[in-house]
Amino acid sequence: MVLWQSDLRVSWRAQWLSLLIHGLVAAVILLMPWPLSYTPLWMVLLSLVVFDCVRSQRRINARQGEIRLLMDGRLRWQGQEWSIVKAPWMIKSGMMLRLRSDGGKRQHLWLAADSMDEAEWRDLRRILLQQETQR
């Protein structure tokens, strides 16, 4: 039985926060007074920041699609069923779910509040908090 479901959208807040953090790190690398002999080092560091920024944006974009919370702490997402391993870590802007598949694969799923409707966000928080108190 489905307790809750939503069609997750891309979280614009998560995208902007990722871009802001990566941009600040890149700015610090560029503005530091590097000696000329350190040019290869700061170029490698800057390349790593850019590649990590791209990877971060791809991961954020992958966090969309239909998601369902089932009975007994199970979650159906991206065509797979996951068990919620621990109580979710919640803040006002999102929650972190620690998941494990039947095959033993583990994953951390960040659900941002702006990736779903406000009513869906409230319902999900309420249901998960109720399940937490019943354990």
From Swiss-Prot:
Residues 1-96 are annotated as: Not required to inhibit FtsZ or MreB polymerization. Residues 33-37 are periplasmic. InterPro entries: YgfX (IPR009883). Residues 1-11, 55-135 are cytoplasmic. It is found in: Cell inner membrane. Its main location: membrane. GO terms for cellular component: plasma membrane. The chain crosses the membrane at residues 12-32, 38-54. One of its GO terms (biological process) is regulation of cell shape. It is a multi-pass membrane protein. Keywords: Cell inner membrane, Cell membrane, Cell shape, Membrane, Transmembrane, Transmembrane helix. Interacts with MreB and FtsZ; interaction with the latter requires FtsZ residues 33-49. A probable inner membrane protein. Has been shown not to be a toxin, no effects on growth are seen in LB or minimal medium up to 6 or 21 hours (respectively) after induction of expression. Interacts with cytoskeletal proteins FtsZ and MreB; inhibits FtsZ GTP-dependent polymerization as well as MreB ATP-dependent polymerization. Restores production of prodigiosin antibiotic (Pig) in Serratia strains with deletions of sdhE-ygfX; overexpression of this protein and CptB also restores Pig production to a slightly lesser extent in Serratia. This is Inner membrane protein YgfX. It comes from Escherichia coli (strain K12). The lineage of its organism: Bacteria, Pseudomonadati, Pseudomonadota, Gammaproteobacteria, Enterobacterales. The gene is ygfX.
